[in-house]
């Protein structure tokens, strides 16, 4: 009698738009479609890392219930429009950007003056409408975070940092806009009692739907690994000197990072075959690699950061015994 559980063998991704996709996984044992679908959905909505405006300072405005001469929108609507701007930061956790515009016309997210390591995903997003003689001068603080953080948590949690005219925003950091899932019937040979999991994911463009589901799965695996390593107190006391376990992600080849062909070839030319090899190198060491420039380095750092890793890390007992080169 078979006792092992089925694992999905078919994973199909159907693009429904630039940041919208349907992911189909099958087959699952009966009941596992809802078990995993609900868990992934909750993680996708609550635990993904993203970027959001958190503080705004507008010239001539003391509080959010003000109005500005020459600006059609009041400050409340202006703030709502600013919260709709989708930012993406590279290799930093926060940045302050400036929006200055004068004269009649439409103000869009593309008018924001950006630092070199910050980009706007939706530059056509409308922020305000200026009439003749109108002027807008705004400082926007953008931060990296997770989930949803109400503005009053920071407003009252930093008494010493109060600034007149600074408006603290509720921040929705999650790059995932909508997630839904459905469980359908699947069949393998004569078995017809299996599950097919269909997930519908839409993001704001900071990450792709495929990357969102990959990250959510890693979060679940990381949380559940604590239970997989569960030991009794007696067993733990008997083996206090056990060698530290190596994170399985470090044993994966650098090809799994899905770098550009140029970056991947440069790493292999330096005998960097595994993620564990890569994270032990410093930025200066990588920049000395032939044909690997600053753009490739930033790509590598960004991909590692999405997995909670950085360059220059120290590993004990590396490489592990039996690791093929």
UniProtKB/Swiss-Prot annotation:
UniProt cross-references to InterPro entries, sorted A to Z: DNA-dir_RNA_pol_insert, DNA-dir_RNA_pol_RpoA/D/Rpb3, DNA-dir_RpoA, RBP11-like, RNAP_asu_C, RNApol_insert_sf
Signal is among the record's keywords: no
GO biological process: DNA-templated transcription
Stretches the record annotates as Alpha C-terminal domain (alpha-CTD): 246-325
Pfam families (alphabetical): RNA_pol_A_bac, RNA_pol_A_CTD, RNA_pol_L
GO cellular component: a single term: cytoplasm
Molecular function (Gene Ontology), one example: DNA binding
UniProt-annotated stretches for the region Alpha N-terminal domain (alpha-NTD): 1-231
Keyword ATP-binding belongs to the record: no
Source domain of life: Bacteria
EC number(s) from the headed UniProt entry: 2.7.7.6
Reaction catalyzed: RNA(n) + a ribonucleoside 5'-triphosphate = RNA(n+1) + diphosphate
Keywords annotated in UniProt: DNA-directed RNA polymerase, Nucleotidyltransferase, Transcription, Transferase
Family: Belongs to the RNA polymerase alpha chain family.
Function: DNA-dependent RNA polymerase catalyzes the transcription of DNA into RNA using the four ribonucleoside triphosphates as substrates.
Domain comment, as recorded: The N-terminal domain is essential for RNAP assembly and basal transcription, whereas the C-terminal domain is involved in interaction with transcriptional regulators and with upstream promoter elements.
Subunit structure, interactors included: Homodimer. The RNAP catalytic core consists of 2 alpha, 1 beta, 1 beta' and 1 omega subunit. When a sigma factor is associated with the core the holoenzyme is formed, which can initiate transcription.
UniProt-recorded name of the protein: DNA-directed RNA polymerase subunit alpha
Gene that this sequence comes from: rpoA
């Amino acid at each position: 009698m078979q006792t092992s559980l089925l694992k999905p063998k078919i994973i199909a991704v159907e693009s429904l738009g630039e940041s919208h996709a349907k992911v189909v996984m099958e087959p699952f044992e009966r009941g596992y479609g809802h078990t995993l679908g609900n868990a992934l959905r909750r993680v996708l909505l609550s635990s993904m890392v993203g970027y959001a405006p958190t503080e705004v300072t507008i010239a001539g405005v003391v509080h959010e219930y003000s109005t500005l001469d020459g600006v059609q929108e009041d400050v409340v609507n202006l703030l709502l429009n600013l919260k709709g701007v989708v930012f993406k930061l590279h290799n930093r956790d926060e940045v302050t950007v400036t929006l200055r515009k004068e004269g009649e016309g439409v103000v869009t997210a593309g008018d924001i003056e950006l630092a070199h390591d910050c980009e706007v995903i939706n530059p056509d997003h409308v922020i305000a409408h200026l009439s003749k003689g109108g002027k807008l001068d705004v400082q926007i603080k953008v931060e990296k975070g997770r989930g949803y953080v109400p503005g009053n948590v920071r407003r009252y949690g930093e008494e010493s940092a109060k600034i007149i005219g600074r408006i603290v925003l509720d921040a929705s950091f999650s790059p995932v806009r909508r997630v839904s899932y459905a469980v359908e019937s699947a069949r393998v040979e004569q078995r017809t009692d299996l599950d097919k999991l269909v997930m519908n994911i839409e993001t704001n463009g900071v990450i792709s739907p495929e990357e969102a589901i990959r990250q959510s799965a890693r979060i679940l695996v990381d949380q559940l690994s604590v239970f997989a390593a569960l030991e009794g107190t007696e067993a733990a006391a008997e083996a206090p000197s056990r060698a530290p376990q190596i994170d399985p992600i470090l044993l994966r080849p650098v090809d799994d990072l899905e770098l550009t062909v140029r970056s991947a070839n440069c790493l292999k030319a330096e005998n960097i075959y595994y993620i564990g090899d890569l994270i032990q190198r410093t930025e200066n060491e990588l920049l000395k690699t032939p044909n690997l420039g600053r753009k490739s380095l930033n790509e590598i750092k960004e991909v590692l950061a999405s997995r909670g890793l950085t360059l220059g890390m120290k590993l004990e007992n590396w490489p592990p015994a039996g690791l093929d080169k």
